Every structure is written in C-alpha cells, then in structure tokens.
Amino acid sequence: MNDSKPLYRPQFFYTTGASPCPYLDGRMERKVVTEITGPDAETLHNRLSRAGFRRSHNIAYAPVCQGCNACVPIRIAVNDFRLTRTRRRINRTNAGVEMFDVPAQATHEQFMLFQRYQKSRHGDGDMAAMGFTDYRAMVEDTPIQTSILEFRDQDDVLLCACLTDRLNDGLSAVYSFYDPDLPQRSLGSYAILSMVAQTKAEGLPYLYLGYWVANSRKMAYKSAYQPAEILSRGAWRPLTQADIEEQEEQTRPLFRPSATGFSTGQE
C-alpha cells in the first residue's frame, strides 16, 4: 500500500488530562489522541504508527508527558533478527504449537484466557475488570486491517492470542495474552518469535512492539529483542547499549522505601 497520497480532510489532535502513569510509580501521564476514521484510515494509521503512535479501538495515541520521555517507540528489524540459544530452546519447547491467523472477532474461549491472564499478571489493573462486552470492543472496534494470531497446542487448546494490526511496512503487536499457568513454555516470548517469523514470511521489514519503558516490569523486556530500532527525535535509528543505560537511569523510581519512610531517590 502506498500511503504517500495526501489526506483530503483535516485531522484533529487533542491532549488528555493528566492521570497516574501505569508503568512507572510516582509519575503522571498525558496523551495526544486522534480518531482514525473514514476512507483514509489505513493511510493515516500507517503514518501515525511510523510517528510513534499506537492504536486502541479507533483512537491513535502517543505520550506527551511533561518532563518524561520514558515511553520509547520500538520495533524489531526482522530481516536482521537472529535466534539466540535460549530462543531456539523456546521454539523447541513449543514445537507442537500451531499459529492460526483468524479474523478480529471476539470469542468466549479467548475471553476466558484473557481473564485468567489479567487476574494472574495484572490483577491491580483496569483491564482485570473488563467484561466480555469490553473485550469484544477491544478486539472488534478497529477501522483498519486487524486480526488475531491464536496459538493452539496439539489438543486444540488455546494457549496464547495476539491482537495484531497490519501496516504497509510490518505487523504491529497491539495486545497479547497467554496461559499464565504454563511458565515453562515462555509463551510471551514464543509469541514474539512467531510474529517475527510471520512478519518476515510476509516480506515486511518490521514488527512494531509499542513502547519500551526501561525499569517497568510490564514494558522493559522489549529491549531484549535485537537488533531493534527506536524512534528518537523524530527518526528511527538502531537501539544501542548506551540508549538502554541512559533510559534505565532516567526511569529509575522517583520514590523508594527507606527505613524512615520514603526517599525521593535523589541522594
């Protein structure tokens, strides 16, 4: 798809109010948001994705937090990606698992797995309280080409699911969840490895992973998938060890427990 054509209607962007950051304690987040609608939705989504935006329903958003640049857009350059010994082991462990690319239609089977994952991994988060109607909206409210990658074992049991957008230069992992009772399978890692392989098989150069946030237990893992690229000062460039060290320093906790109460971490 060629998205170089001009958009024939104005695009409006809005800034949200401040709210507690879901990734780093003691920080506040703000977002810039815009609606993805109309005949140019695919073109707009492609452009916004390359500019560091993410999609939720028919909304594209990006962080604009005052005094904080912790959320770094990251993508894997799949043609240069190489399997480590650990990742080969993960693939072998899941040799009997098959991936199916299915339409973005919510099922109760998916939702039951989604609930188990949320309660186990993110029990204190807003998504843990989602009902089936909310889950269906997350999956099906999309103005662009979206599907679900389902991972099933040899008994056809659903082990993992990844809501996935298709861009003109890659795949975008919107949200993934998996069986929390099978840690030996490393299903989260296996899903990423499978998506890397799928992206490459489709002749596309990038797998977009969303935001990398150093020192966040939810988001820090993404820098381990290299070679990767990050969006820095408006341009994509290779992620370096210096970037990782710099982000780890910038995202260290603002508050930490001490014997006398709380410390600001500024000593």
From Swiss-Prot:
BP terms from Gene Ontology: ubiquitin-dependent protein catabolic process via the N-end rule pathway
Main localization, broad class: cytoplasm
Coiled-coil zones: none
Entry's localization field: Cytoplasm
Catalytic activity: N-terminal L-glutamyl-[protein] + L-leucyl-tRNA(Leu) = N-terminal L-leucyl-L-glutamyl-[protein] + tRNA(Leu) + H(+); N-terminal L-aspartyl-[protein] + L-leucyl-tRNA(Leu) = N-terminal L-leucyl-L-aspartyl-[protein] + tRNA(Leu) + H(+)
Protein EC: 2.3.2.29
Major enzyme class: transferase
Region (Disordered): 246-267
GO MF annotation terms: arginyl-tRNA--protein transferase activity; leucyl-tRNA--protein transferase activity
InterPro entries named in the record: Acyl_CoA_acyltransferase (IPR016181), Asp_Glu_LeuTrfase (IPR017138), N-end_Aminoacyl_Trfase (IPR030700), N-end_Aminoacyl_Trfase_C (IPR007472), N-end_Aminoacyl_Trfase_N (IPR007471)
Listed NCBIfam families: PRK01305.1-1, PRK01305.1-3, PRK01305.1-4, PRK01305.2-3
Function: Functions in the N-end rule pathway of protein degradation where it conjugates Leu from its aminoacyl-tRNA to the N-termini of proteins containing an N-terminal aspartate or glutamate.
Protein name: Aspartate/glutamate leucyltransferase
Organism: Granulibacter bethesdensis (strain ATCC BAA-1260 / CGDNIH1)
